[in-house]
Amino acid sequence: MIRFRQIRRLAGIASVLAKYRLEDVLAKTSLARLARLIAWVQPWRAKATDEPLGRRLRMALDDLGPIFVKLGQMLSTRRDLLPKDIADELALLQDRVAPFPGDQARTAVEKALGQPISEVFSEFQDEALASASVAQVHAAVLANGDEVVVKVLRPGIGARVRRDLELINILALMVDRFWTGAANVRPVELVAELAGTLHNELDLQREAANASQLKRNFTGDRELYVPSIYWDYTFRQVMVMERVYGIPIDNVEA
């Protein structure tokens, strides 16, 4: 049964669909009808109605939040199923989210460590080096002088992921039932794949184990260096890794 909170969120999704005139995406579902009603009652809210479908879809997913952005990123890789112009637009989606406050990161790290940060780190930068939908990264220096980066899960991210996945699954079932092209895209399977990806991202110990295995696989390789994990300070919610300086892979000029 759909709860009131979910109904309110679905209404918000319908509003975004109306904003970008994407009502037809959900075909004959009640959500599409609600989006058309919103577009009719508040036509001034419609944006980018002359833009190509792919661009409107990208902007809508961006508005709907980080979990929907990840769904769009995953869809962009399905070039065997999506038209090239839509796949190209979705590939432009970036997992960019404003960082949460440094004091919250400190609290999360201390909770995981079971001791004050000052007992483990001689330095801990409150300003995040990078921030994404599931976690963010802080620079730090261990008490022994080693430079490290500390990855911290966002407060409450587990509950938010569960809520959004429930909604996305509802939408996938709607699309699967009413959209004639659903058999090619297989939306329910796609959401299950997204859920698996997010489940892995919510467990930093699993990520650390994968990184350690990768390091073992490339031991002695002169072309690739994988940073070391500091297992004494790595938990499900917090991961500490050797800091390595380099050039971003997308910096072609460098």
Where on the chain are the PLM-derived regions?
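N-terminal accessory/targeting segments that precede structured cores
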Residues: M1-Q136, N144, R160-P187
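Short beta-strand elements
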Residues: H138-L142, E242-Y245
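Residues located in well-ordered beta-strands
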Residues: Q136, K151, Y225-S228
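Residue-level signature of catalytic and energy-coupling elements of molecular machines
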Residues: G72, V137, V150, E207, ...
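Well-ordered beta-strand positions
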Residues: A128-A130, V141, Y230-D232
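Glycine-rich ATP phosphate-binding loop
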Residues: A139, D146-R154
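ATP-dependent phospho-/nucleotidyl transfer catalytic cores
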Residues: A91-A98, E110, G158-R163, L173-A254
